[in-house]
């Protein structure tokens, strides 16, 4: 019985996605390991060319219901007075990837100084998304076909949509304000509210994201300039808030960065319910970083979903020669 409850939950979630019912974006736990996804204003924020890779398996207890792979590249271009970036993300839902989306995006972030060591980044992003449905009546099962005692016993009257693949453009914008040891940002995605439903014209709700944090050196020794927190303990408290389609998400916690090790813990919740505790460990060198996080679900879905696993990889390439030294945003990399 428990098995069929899990399958039914998967199908209900997929049907909601097919019909465009308050579709929600994928949520990553290691926000700053996938910075361009959080806010396009992060493009070029590290100055050096940066490659970011993320793999996320959400709710593996539901037959790998949600699997997401993301990759991005960005760097600062002095002649453009800002950073450029590109992101590619693929998301699969359901057994055998029944419902999937692939998004390709490009962005530009203009940077300017407002006061001594205080800077602002303003960014625009354009993306193209392909949503696709694998319609196979031999393997698809619907909630109306289930019987708690006997499994799948009924026939389905579900009708295939006219199109099983749709492509649509979308746009986003963002802003970042930062100083020597603090940062804050705001971003809005799906500004044009594209329709992604296979059966209806329901539109993707705009996603609003706000983030803020700081860096606190626990050692009184003068920090080295070659690498953030090299060999010294640094605590980074941070906060992220997101709103989309009537749903609120709060994520607050901190990192402890003690080169070459990094650990973090956060708590994520909505307004009326708890979601998960997030635990992260990582290893880093000057130009190479890898992290792993686990979402320990504390909501009513805890017994069925088995949380979420996320693995990230970050690579910084050598900085091209520049006439003037450019300051990077000093925020976590995981």
Model-assigned labels for residue ranges:
Residues 24-334:
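Subset of outer-membrane beta-barrel
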Residues 4-16:
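Sec-dependent N-terminal signal peptides
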Residues 18-23:
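Sec/Tat signal peptide C-region and signal peptidase I cleavage site
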